[in-house]
Amino acid sequence: CKEVFFMKKNIIVKKNSVTYQIPPQNVVYMEKDLRRIVIHLSGMASSELVVYGSFHDLIPNLDERFLYCHRSYIINMDEIIIMSHNQILLSSNEGIYFGKDTYRKAQKTFEEYMQRKRKEFS
C-alpha cells in the first residue's frame, strides 16, 4: 500500500500529492471498494478520504481499537454505539450489516476489547 503509511501511531495518507496525518481516534471506519480504501473520518474538515491500497497492507499497522471482521470493513471499536443482531451502529449514525457468523466474531472481539479498556481505567 504505497499511499498509506504510519508514523508515531498516526496514519499518514497521501492523496493527489497532498499528505494528511490522521490521528487514529479520528477514523470511524475504513471501507474497501475494489482497489480503493475509503477512510470515514470524524473531527476533521473532510468527512472521508479515498486512497488506493489494500487492507492487507493496513492491518499489521493498526492498533487494537480497530476491528477487521469483514473483508470490506475495518471499524474503530471506540466509535461503536450499538451492536445488535447483525448490525453495528457507529457514532456517525451509519450502520454496518454483517452475517450471523461474522457478527458473532465481531461481538466477541468488541466485548473483549471493552473489558480490557475497563481494566485500564479502573
Name each region found by the language model.
Residues 1-122:
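Basic, polyanion-interacting recognition surfaces, primarily
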